[in-house]
């Protein structure tokens, strides 16, 4: 049996197993089918919109069929990108050669896309979230719910904030998060993978069939090729999803220097420890087991450090000596390497809180990216990592201290 056949057989077995054992996949109906909209149309935004639109089309008892996707309007050979998507049913710039469902409608008008939505899925580079949310204030249903697929933090005078919390604060709607070992091209090609959705049921929950809950979110995102686990640890998966991009830059540096797999593994080991420490230090409500049990944790870290935009950018930085910003422009076709922004935000917060010495890898990535510290200094910058402090952090959690 070929490897592809074995993988397909494994996926079928897992799908059948979930049908038998997962109560969240039981039949769910809504009093009024939910309208779903997606904000963002990059490769990951378009991929998630594809997943969602496939499910809304198959489940009329739960969702309205049409899914609107907000597209930042740009011209492709003189034709608006939204028009191309709606005519060819492909996002020729950010997700070429992938057919999109005909019930997925591209819309360059942000308010028209979101004003009637019951579920809003945010999937844009996180540095643009503020201006997008500002436009949406007072223009959406007050009863809407949201899921953020963004990776990063909002850093301000009051400290570091989860992007899902930022959406809730600014729009007054409950917002969860989606994160996992999900390279967009592989999901778009329907290669089997898994992800984690985290959502906290709000105090104003209206009841089964009247509001969004874990079962509804499972039905919205789960596909035979895209397995979903729904939990309530929004903080945990958000932290892991943001910080893995910083670790991936470190892996890209050592890859570009030609140091091999051993060096990349060392970066990932140190990085995982710092991710857990960051969560316990600044978001004590996060759960340690999320980092090693969920796709959004160590699985996503491994995948991101094996490929993806952040590794590509950092590798090219090491090979050419160019800045991250320049490499991003050169090779990413208008997309972003989120680690470049996140490492700066994390540095700003750690510096203001006096904790830079507690996170030597995060600080090293920042210093290399923005302060011209030679990449060859990376091993010496992280070799004094206090492993005992990370171990104590995990141990104290397990003991309930």
Curated annotation (Swiss-Prot):
Q: Which UniProt keywords apply?
A: Cytoplasm, NAD, Oxidoreductase
Give a GO cellular-component term: nucleus
Family recorded in the similarity comment: Belongs to the NAD-dependent glycerol-3-phosphate dehydrogenase family.
Identify this protein by name. Answer: Glycerol-3-phosphate dehydrogenase [NAD(+)] 1
- Gene behind this protein: GPD1
Q: What is its EC number?
A: 1.1.1.8
Any single GO molecular-function term of the entry would be: protein homodimerization activity
- What SUPFAM superfamilies does this protein's entry cite? 6-phosphogluconate dehydrogenase C-terminal domain-like, NAD(P)-binding Rossmann-fold domains
Question: Active-site positions, per UniProt?
Answer: 244
Extract the NCBIfam families matched here.
Answer: glycerol3P_DH
Specify which residues bind substrate according to the UniProt entry for this protein.
151, 309-310
GO BP, one annotated term: glycerol-3-phosphate catabolic process
What are the disulphide bonds in this sequence? Answer: none
- In terms of superkingdom, the source organism counts as Eukaryota
Report residues binding NAD(+).
Answer: 40-45, 128, 151, 184, 309, 338
The scientific name of the source species is: Zygosaccharomyces rouxii
């Amino acid at each position: 049996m070929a490897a592809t056949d074995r993988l397909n057989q494994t996926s079928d077995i897992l799908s059948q197993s979930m049908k038998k054992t997962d109560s969240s996949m039981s039949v769910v109906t809504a009093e009024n089918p939910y309208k779903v909209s997606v904000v963002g149309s990059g490769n990951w935004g378009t991929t998630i919109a594809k997943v969602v639109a496939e499910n809304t089309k198959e489940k009329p008892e739960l969702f309205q069929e049409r899914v609107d996707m907000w597209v930042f309007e740009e011209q492709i050979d003189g034709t608006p990108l939204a028009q191309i998507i709606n005519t060819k049913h492909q996002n020729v710039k950010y997700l070429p050669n992938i057919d999109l469902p005909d019930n997925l409608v591209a819309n360059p008008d942000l308010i028209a896309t979101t004003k009637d939505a019951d579920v809003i899925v945010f999937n844009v580079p996180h540095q643009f979230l503020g201006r997008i949310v500002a436009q949406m204030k007072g223009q959406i249903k007050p009863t809407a719910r949201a899921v953020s697929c963004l990776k990063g933090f909002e850093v301000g005078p009051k400290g570091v904030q989860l992007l899902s919390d930022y959406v809730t604060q600014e729009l007054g709607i409950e917002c969860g998060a989606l994160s996992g070992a999900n390279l967009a091209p592989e999901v778009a090609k329907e290669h089997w993978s898994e992800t984690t959705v985290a959502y906290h049921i709000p105090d104003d929950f209206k009841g089964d069939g009247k509001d969004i809950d874990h079962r509804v979110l499972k039905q919205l995102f789960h596909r035979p090729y895209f397995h979903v686990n729904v939990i309530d640890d929004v903080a945990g998966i958000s932290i892991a999803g943001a910080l893995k991009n910083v670790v991936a830059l470190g892996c890209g540096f050592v890859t570009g220097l030609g140091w091999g797999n051993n060096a990349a593994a060392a970066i990932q080991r140190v990085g995982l420890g710092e991710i857990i420490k960051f969560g316990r230090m600044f978001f004590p409500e996060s759960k340690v087991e999320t980092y090693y049990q969920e796709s959004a944790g160590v699985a996503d870290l491994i995948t991101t450090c094996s490929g993806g935009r952040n590794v590509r950018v950092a590798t090219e930085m090491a090979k050419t000596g160019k800045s991250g910003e320049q490499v991003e422009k050169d090779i990413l076709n208008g997309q972003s390497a989120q680690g470049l922004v996140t490492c700066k935000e994390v540095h700003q917060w750690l510096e203001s809180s006096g904790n830079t010495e507690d996170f030597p890898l995060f600080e090293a990535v920042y210093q290399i990216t923005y302060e011209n510290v030679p990449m060859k200094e990376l091993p010496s910058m992280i070799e004094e990592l206090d492993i005992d402090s990370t171990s104590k952090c995990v141990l104290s959690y397990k003991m309930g201290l």
